[in-house]
């Protein structure tokens, strides 16, 4: 048992999906896993372990933002021995070529957060995905016929920014989307020598708000992302 997770040793698989929304974790467990057992309800941050196509996997919510995912991911890695972590979440498109319901695989994550600069104030430490996971996820998504973009994302500390033009300028530099967790997850993976990847479904298009999705759609309809994440988790077994 850790401070924020009530599971016992052995309750959590060594590979896990990490949606931000705990209700999305519940949805994944109920709709994709067999024999799913809930291992955590602390702070309503639901976590489950079950099997997917005969492979033992877990899924757990992380909440919103880098401080929150840093708490849960670190405890999963350090206290429970998780070796492979895939974030499955939503993002807002800033690249004009990226649209709602398409996937973005975060090859790297820029950030405006100080969560990494607290450790390395004198330079920018690049946050990158595990290439093996990235490669597998890309080919799995392509085989499924899912429109998928690979590239940089911005992990932001701010959802409601007062300077949206600064974020939009990044789209002109090839940054695909804005989200709030990947950079912290990648930094933890680098520290602890484990594998991590961010798979995002575009829920909002900052270039065209008419494409935006509802809260219910974000919770229950982004199943392509969930399938790609699960298939990627078991691809090494």
Swiss-Prot record:
UniProt: a purine D-ribonucleoside binding residues: 4, 179-181, 203-204
Any GO MF annotation of the entry: purine-nucleoside phosphorylase activity
Matching SUPFAM superfamilies: Purine and uridine phosphorylases
Pfam families: PNP_UDP_1
Enzyme Commission numbers on file: 2.4.2.1
NCBIfam families: deoD, PRK05819.1
Gene: deoD
PANTHER family: FI09636P-RELATED, URIDINE PHOSPHORYLASE
Gene3D superfamilies assigned: Nucleoside phosphorylase domain (3.40.50.1580)
Site (Important for catalytic activity): 218
EC main group: transferase
PROSITE patterns (alphabetical): PNP_UDP_1
Biological process per Gene Ontology, one example term: purine nucleoside catabolic process
Known role: Catalyzes the reversible phosphorolytic breakdown of the N-glycosidic bond in the beta-(deoxy)ribonucleoside molecules, with the formation of the corresponding free purine bases and pentose-1-phosphate.
Protein name (record): Purine nucleoside phosphorylase DeoD-type
Keyword annotations: Glycosyltransferase, Transferase
Catalytic activity entry: a purine D-ribonucleoside + phosphate = a purine nucleobase + alpha-D-ribose 1-phosphate; a purine 2'-deoxy-D-ribonucleoside + phosphate = a purine nucleobase + 2-deoxy-alpha-D-ribose 1-phosphate
Gene source species: Streptococcus pyogenes serotype M12 (strain MGAS2096)
């Amino acid at each position: 048992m850790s401070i924020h997770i009530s599971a016992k040793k052995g309750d959590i698989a060594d590979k896990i999906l990490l949606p931000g929304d705990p209700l999305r974790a519940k949805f994944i467990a109920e709709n994709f896993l067999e024999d799913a057992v809930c291992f955590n309800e602390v702070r309503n941050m639901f976590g489950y372990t079950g099997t997917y196509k005969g492979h033992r996997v877990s899924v757990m919510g992380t909440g919103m933002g880098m401080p929150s995912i840093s708490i849960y991911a670190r405890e999963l890695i350090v206290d429970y021995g998780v070796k492979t972590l895939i974030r499955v979440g939503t993002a807002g498109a800033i690249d004009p070529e990226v649209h709602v319901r398409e996937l973005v695989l975060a090859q790297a994550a820029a950030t405006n957060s100080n969560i990494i600069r607290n450790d390395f104030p004198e330079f920018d430490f690049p946050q990158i995905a595990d290439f093996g996971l990235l490669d597998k996820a890309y080919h799995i998504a392509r085989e499924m016929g899912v429109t998928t973009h690979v590239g940089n994302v911005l992990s932001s500390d701010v959802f409601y920014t007062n300077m949206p033009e600064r974020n939009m300028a990044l789209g002109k530099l090839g940054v695909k989307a804005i989200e709030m967790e990947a950079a912290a997850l990648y930094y933890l993976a680098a520290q602890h020598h484990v594998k991590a990847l961010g798979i995002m479904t575009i829920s909002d298009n900052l270039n065209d708000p008419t494409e935006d999705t509802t809260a219910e759609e974000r919770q229950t309809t982004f199943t392509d992302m969930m399938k790609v994440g699960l298939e990627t988790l078991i691809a090494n077994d």
